[in-house]
């Protein structure tokens, strides 16, 4: 069964760029990591800055898809890349995820094993990844619409965390953590400020090379801005599970 992981590190400003370069220079070793199906280093952005996200030059992320859980464990237990990624960081976080559904598109050949995956229930916590390349002609339209979505997301108690990502120039990606699948669906497709943004985006492609996937959060460690949104989501899920007997 494939396993995904997201790794985030924040560095002191004087050493942030140097730390990112050290990781980037190890990309060949990273690509040859045993059991790694696909992976990439991302810049991150704060989506709370409007009208467009502001890149956070102190924080970087690595997203991976592993052939199985054993490959992920080996990576975490002593990979030179993860050691370089953590070196000098003032804050680190990672989450282990189970790919659940690829709803649209493909990212860097991400394996689509939907037929073998356990489907998510509406009350399960969920992590959602969106990805796409913003055509130059759609840049203003896209970021104006993004402002509408961000304002609503900030006020939604079901969203426990949201991070902007970019692995290449001109791409826009988000990774968000939700209390439940049902609440994530309501935000994306239900009535509200998001609906007028979603409908026209289907007829006028604001994003090219789109990718939209959901993940089941399995575990996490560390913090992002002093919090662990996946741990919060899992603790809520455990609290909602009735005790046997």
Regions found by a protein language model. Give the residues of each.
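Acidic/histidine-enriched, beta-strand-rich ligand/metal-binding domains
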Residues: 166-168, 197-203
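Helix-loop elements that line ligand-binding/catalytic pockets
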Residues: 175
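Alpha-helix boundary/capping residues
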Residues: 78-80, 191, 201
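Flexible helix-coil linker/hinge segments at domain or subdomain boundaries
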Residues: 205-207
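A common structural junction motif
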Residues: 80-89, 195-196
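Extended repeat-based interaction scaffolds and adjacent low-complexity, acidic/S/T/P-biased segments
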Residues: 63-65
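Short S/T/G/P-rich N-terminal loop/turn motif that feeds into the first structured element of a domain
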Residues: 1-60, 69-75, 88-172, 182-190, ...
